[in-house]
Structure formats: C-alpha cells, structure tokens
A protein has these predicted regions:
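Positively charged n-region of N-terminal signal peptides that target proteins for export
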Residues: 1-4
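Bacterial N-terminal signal peptides
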Residues: 7-16
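A short catalytic or substrate-binding loop motif that flags glycine-/basic-rich loops and adjacent residues
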Residues: 16-18, 131
C-alpha cells in the first residue's frame, strides 16, 4: 500500500497544474489589523520579473512575464496601497461576443495606474471600455482596509467583501 501511495503521489507531482490559487485575509483576522493577500501563480511562462511603472495617477510595481515590455501585470501594488491579483476562471463567460480574451493583465495594469481604493476600482470599472475581455476572480486590498474579490466576465462583476466573511478570509482557485 505504501508503494502505491508513493507512486500516486509521484504522478501527481509530475502533472502540470494550471490553476492559480489565492486568498485574502481581512484585517479583523490579522494581528496587525490590516488585510493581507497571497497568490500562487501557475503559468506556462517560466521567466517572470517585478517591474516599476509610472502610472497615470499612481506609480506601481507589478509581476509580469519577462518577455513583455509594458501594458500588463499579473499582480501588483501601487503607491496608494492599492493591491490587485487574479485567478483565471473558465466558467464565468455569459456571452458569445467575438472579442479578444485573456486581458486580465491589461485590466490590472490600468487599475494599478488609476485606483487607490476598492471604491475607486468600482467607479473606474464604469469607465473601462467593454467588453473587458476577462474571465477571472480579481482580489483587491487597499490601505483603507478594503478587502474583496470581484468575480468578473466581459461586462459584469459580483463582489465578495472579505471583511463581511464570518471566518475573515476567502480562498479562490
């Protein structure tokens, strides 16, 4: 039995997993009283880097694929304390629009450049051109203590406020 278990475990370790996992912990569940976020990024791009950008309103740092020069990041934080990350989802699309998809990195790049708080993000989304070209869960925390996930597709979102969760956290994969 031990050999079978070891063999199965070895197979699982060698299989590729392409699902990001993230979690947000609200300030009510952290010793500092400030929210925290974590993302495990599964990607086919093995070369990544952290880059600094002078944004439209805010300067920011972001995680990006090394071959990219500008225009998209896969998580980041700006000088106002606004942080964003995403996990891809493949079951949120409700339309059959013929549009470019996989634009999550572009959306996060522009959000970091323009938003300081969760409220700013929601207001900014009303001006961001649709279709958004996304199918993902975006995790956001801010310096004001905001902590939320946004389940988004091309034209709408559902907000999950982590500060109202009884356990004080939310895990998304």
């Amino acid at each position: 039995m031990k050999r079978i278990t070891l063999f199965l475990f070895a197979i699982v370790l060698t299989c590729g997993a392409w699902a990001c996992t993230s979690f947000i912990i609200s300030g009510k569940a952290t010793p500092s009283g400030k929210p925290a976020m974590f993302k495990h990024r599964d990607t086919g791009e093995l070369n990544n880097r952290i880059a600094y950008f002078e944004g439209k309103k805010y300067a920011f740092i972001g995680l990006m694929n090394s071959p990219m020069l500008d225009g998209e990041v896969w998580s980041g934080m700006n000088e106002a304390g606004f942080c964003i990350m995403n996990t891809a989802s493949y079951n949120l699309r409700e339309d059959t629009l013929d549009c470019q998809m996989d634009r999550e990195g572009e959306l996060m790049y522009h959000a970091l450049s323009n938003c300081a708080t969760i409220a700013d993000f929601e207001a900014w989304l009303t001006t961001y051109p649709q279709p958004w070209g996304v199918e993902a869960n975006f995790g956001i925390i801010d310096a004001q203590g905001g902590a939320a996930y946004y389940e988004m597709n091309n034209s709408r979102y559902i907000k999950y406020d982590v500060n109202t969760m009884p356990e004080g956290y939310r895990v998304v994969t």
